[in-house]
Amino acid sequence: LDRRRPLAQWLTSPTNSLFARSITNRYMGYLMGRGLVEPIDDMRSTNPPSNAALLEALSQDLVANKYDLKQLMKTIMTSRLYQLTSDSTALNASDRRFYSHYRVKRIPAEPLLDAIDQATGVKTKFRNLPLGTNATDLPDAEYPNYFLTTFAKPRRASVCECERMPDENLAQALHTLNGDTLATKIADAKGRVAQLIESKVSHEEVVREIYMAALCRWPSDSELSLSNEFLAE
């Protein structure tokens, strides 16, 4: 008898609202910088959500879509709430709970390393795993990587979300500026920078490709002008 099967069936049962609410709250926290319930793993009756109706609606939608997490992310990310500006006003500058403006948040260690790999065109090799494995796909904490450790990837010693420390520190700044993670990838002979130099494309094309690879958008006119001036020097 596989006891995991009835457990999974109970967790995902439409009658078990706790699981759907917990998953929904976590994804709100990951995408919005703050969950409807905070801390995001402290789901209890004495810690009510900031917007109970929204949590209930998203949870019911998750159940209706058979716990399709991609659909949940799509629902959140195509909402007006997710697309609000991060610029605050005099009226909402102090708001940290009700999503009156988008909350700027730091990218966690794993997707940050994956983003660097994408921007530079050089994949990180993890021990005993095939080249091309993303940091976000690591099965457990038994794959040491200095960058991930420096940027607070948790050791998964507990189930508490508090194990991942969101605060910046000096070691992260120094490693970004002087460490070998970025420097090695930028200088890689098979990386994006080397390929752009070898292709002999214009400065404008170089800037456009790097912006798209790093930020998933084209540079603005002012950014393009400033970057062209820098490359011309």
What feature does the model see in each segment?
Residues 1-128, 154-164, 183-233:
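Primarily short, surface-exposed interaction patches in extracytoplasmic proteins
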Residues 6, 98, 115, 134-137, ...:
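Generic structural signal for residues positioned in beta-strands
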Residues 120-123, 127-129, 136-137, 141, ...:
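Long, His/Glu/Asp-enriched segments that create or flank divalent metal/ion-associated functional microenvironments
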Residues 134-142, 194-200:
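Amphipathic alpha-helical surface "interface" segments used
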Residues 168, 176-186:
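Structured, non-catalytic alpha/beta "coupling" segments that mediate domain-domain communication
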